[in-house]
Amino acid sequence: MYAQTCCSGGIPLSNNIGMSVEEKGTFQLSLNYDYNNLNTLNNGTEKLNDDSRLRITNSILFNISYAVTNRLSVEGLFTWVNQRRVISQFGNENLDQTSGIGDGLLLLKYNFKNGLGKNSNIELGLGAKIPFGSSTETNNQGITLNADLQPGSNAWDVVYFLSASKQANFRPSLTFSGRIIYRSTGTNNSYFENSSYKFGNEIQTFLGVSDQFSILKTLATPSISLKYRDAKQDEIDGFNLDNTGGNWLFIIPDFSINIKPNLVFSTRAELPLYSNVDGTQLTPTYRITTGFLFKIKPKSKLLNLR
């Protein structure tokens, strides 16, 4: 949402939606592991010389998509998450962590083929983030942890999706793409039982280029993209919460390879180029995502010749 937290450490929902719209009847299944390391403390754009705080999020992400028609598809994302926060001071280490089912997402997408000319696609989508995860986990002392460490949010969000891609005329395997995801967040009205909490609205934009090459009798697809993320400040009881929100720019190198015609292995890194946070916050140091994509295409219809 990739991340619904003051320090960008949450489940990467928004980063992991937008599977391609395939021919009618095609199922797509994707299983990924996501590791997000935050060990950089910023005050605004200034990096502070303080590595005493560490935040790690481990996520298991399961996507499923079905092509209802050649243009319309429905996609779901289900998650499991482990969040860890470590503070080391004066030789002592304080660890808070939670694990469990995270929030999910349901997205309906429509593909306008050749919307930007020959060999192009435009996809529009509308969806919802569904609050499956717990938002009341406690530490070892029985104290309820803050919202940014909870597996879930106890709030429904509305998700707007727009993507576009176009193949180069001079090299059809070369593809330029862009994607915009806007998340309008809902409110948890039972935060600490009698308060309300709202994560900041968020927009993410991606610009990328990919190409395909034949390697060892199979296809490999390297790509590079830029991601810009802007998150507004969180709110508690209707008031802006300091040290939340900001904007970031990342570079994302990605490599995927076809193990079989219907099975793809991929891995990518997300590295920060620019971070500008509100107040003082932990900000991403690096993120690694790796996993598999499996496609089940409909059986070809047999022609009955009489």
Give residue ranges: language-model regions.
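Residues that define the transmembrane beta-barrel architecture of outer-membrane proteins
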Residues: 25, 56-60, 98-106, 120, ...
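Outer membrane beta-barrel transmembrane domains
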Residues: 40-42, 48-50, 188-306
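Transmembrane beta-barrel strands of outer-membrane/channel proteins
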Residues: 31-37, 76-80, 124-130, 176-182, ...
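Outer-membrane beta-barrel biogenesis signature
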Residues: 2-40, 117, 121-123, 297-306
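Residue-level signature of outer-membrane beta-barrel architecture
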Residues: 33, 66, 78, 110-112, ...
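Outer-membrane beta-barrel channels and translocator barrels
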Residues: 24, 36, 69-71, 81, ...
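Surface-exposed strand-loop-strand hairpins of Gram-negative outer-membrane beta-barrel proteins
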Residues: 34-59
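Outer-membrane pore/translocation modules
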Residues: 83-86, 91-198
